[in-house]
């Protein structure tokens, strides 16, 4: 029996994934499923450039902006939710189209994942209380005693990873990195993944990155982050989306708005460069779509269903 198709549309930030994926879903009777680790959070749709409501009104979108920013989210949790949505979409006769640039999620979905046990809520609260009392440096020192491997790999300024590693070693008695040596678990072995990699020319991509981030700053991102700062302690939130730290620094009068934007643009370009390198080296079997200007991109959009040899539907 032939395997069912799943499309994964990936690429660096600002490469046009959302636009292209939306057009593809409309052309091929598909539904969109998020595969971006930051676009799951409901309080930050602007800074994460989540798909607009106009897109969501035309076709079904799944796993976008549904999770409170206070809730921890792991690759295992994502995979379970994604598998449910993929099975639901295919059961309805539609084509699942996954869009995003989070390499860990894509790699785990396609090639399998290391299943790290869930952390109990009691322990999670205890570790956060401890961190609040002793800070990053002392928590890193304590991690060194319990898990020297993790402490050597995790910078003490990386609060989220530091807390996560400390939780895991307390919960399991094992290093968080020890789980990487275990056999990987596959959850969608009955599917065939067709991976499309958007590969814009570097200079063109950087131009789009700068323009998009400037628009994001103008279109409400500052108010969005100001509200989060008012309601929550940012130290305990999963605020890794580029631009958030810079806006927080602006709100705390540590940077001017221009400095915050310039710094965020620089970080975005560096992030895009790392993404391109990762996709080129980690995902060997893929369809690469190259383009160097807006006209090239529009041509790719018009011809995509032909280029990747897709039927009009997955029925």
Swiss-Prot record:
Keyword Cell wall biogenesis/degradation applies: no
Catalytic activities: adenosine(37) in tRNA + dimethylallyl diphosphate = N(6)-dimethylallyladenosine(37) in tRNA + diphosphate
Alphabetical UniProt keywords: ATP-binding, Magnesium, Nucleotide-binding, Transferase, tRNA processing
Enzyme Commission number(s) from the entry: 2.5.1.75
GO function terms (MF aspect): ATP binding; tRNA dimethylallyltransferase activity
Protein residues bound to substrate: 13-18
Site (Interaction with substrate tRNA): 102, 124
Transmembrane segments: none
Region (Interaction with substrate tRNA) location: 36-39, 160-164
Known partners and oligomeric status: Monomer.
HAMAP family in alphabetical order: IPP_trans
Protein name: tRNA dimethylallyltransferase
């Amino acid at each position: 029996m032939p395997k069912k198709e799943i499309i994964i549309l990936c690429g660096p930030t600002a490469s046009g994934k959302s636009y292209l994926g939306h057009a593809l879903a409309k052309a091929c009777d598909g539904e969109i499923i998020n595969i971006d680790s930051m676009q799951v959070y409901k309080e930050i749709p602007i800074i994460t450039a989540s798909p607009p409501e106009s897109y969501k009104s035309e076709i079904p979108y799944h796993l976008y902006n549904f999770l409170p920013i206070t809730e921890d989210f792991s690759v295992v949790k994502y995979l379970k939710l994604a598998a449910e949505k993929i099975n639901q979409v295919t059961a309805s006769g539609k084509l699942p189209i996954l869009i995003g640039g989070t390499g860990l999620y894509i790699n785990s979905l396609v090639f399998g994942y290391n299943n790290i046990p869930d952390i109990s809520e009691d322990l999670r609260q205890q570790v956060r209380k401890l961190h609040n009392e002793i800070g990053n440096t002392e928590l890193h020192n304590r991690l060194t005693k319990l898990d020297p491997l993790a402490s050597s790999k995790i910078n003490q300024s990386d609060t989220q990873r530091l807390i996560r590693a400390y939780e895991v070693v307390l919960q399991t008695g094992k290093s968080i990195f020890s789980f990487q040596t275990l056999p990987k678990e596959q959850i969608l072995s009955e599917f065939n993944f067709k991976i499309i990699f958007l590969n814009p020319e570097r200079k063109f991509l950087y131009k789009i990155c700068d323009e998009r981030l400037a628009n994001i700053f103008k279109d409400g991102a500052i108010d969005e982050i100001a509200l989060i700062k008012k309601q929550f302690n940012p130290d305990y939130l999963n605020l890794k989306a580029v631009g958030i730290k810079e806006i927080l620094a602006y709100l705390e009068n540590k940077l001017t708005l221009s400095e915050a934007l310039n710094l965020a643009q620089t970080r975005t370009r560096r992030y895009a460069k790392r993404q391109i390198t990762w996709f080129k080296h980690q995902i060997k079997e893929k369809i690469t779509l190259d383009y160097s200007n807006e006209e090239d991109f529009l041509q790719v959009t018009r011809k995509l269903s032909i280029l990747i040899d897709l039927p009009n539907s997955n029925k």
